[in-house]
Amino acid sequence: MSDEITNGAAKPTEAISGPTFTIEKIYIKDVSFEAPNSPAVFNEAGQPELQLNLNQRVQRLNENAFELVLHVTLTCTAAGKTAYVVEVQQAGVFGLFGLDQHAIGVLLGTQCPNILFPYVRSLVSDLIQIGGFPPFYLQPINFDALYAETLRQRAQNEKEGSQISSHPAGNA
């Protein structure tokens, strides 16, 4: 009798058939914290202003592997001076097997950033606190809505581009 317990998942040596999504690796690609006006900025009164910039980049590594990098820059200013700048590039390598292009696009545009975002949130918060500033927590981001908006804009741009090219340059 075997002491091995299985939960119905495929054993590593068994071939997995059908569409498959795997997380191969999650890692920090780049991280930076700058507080150029400390310690003077700690005494600034007033409400700080925050500017968040978020984007993602996808690179195909091979037929079934993709690297997604979630890049976040958070800049805090107080009384017109930069209090801090946090920059994080959190990356992951994801395996996408047996999926069509549409499904790959959806996973890379929604599921992969949703997997990476908690790592970004934690790292940004920790860096800010270690830097001597009050905690800041990145609020949840609806990557599904962002992906849908990107598709809508892309379709609109293609539609406008085809309308422009379908009109003659001039009439004689």
UniProtKB/Swiss-Prot annotation:
GO terms for molecular function: unfolded protein binding. SUPFAM superfamilies: SecB-like. It is found in: Cytoplasm. Its main location: cytoplasm. It comes from the Bacteria. Pfam families: SecB. GO terms for cellular component: cytoplasm. GO terms for biological process: protein folding; protein tetramerization; protein transport. InterPro entries: SecB, SecB-like_sf. The keyword Chaperone applies. The keyword Signal does not apply. Keywords: Chaperone, Cytoplasm, Protein transport, Translocation, Transport. One of the proteins required for the normal export of preproteins out of the cell cytoplasm. It is a molecular chaperone that binds to a subset of precursor proteins, maintaining them in a translocation-competent state. It also specifically binds to its receptor SecA. Belongs to the SecB family. Homotetramer, a dimer of dimers. One homotetramer interacts with 1 SecA dimer. This is Protein-export protein SecB.
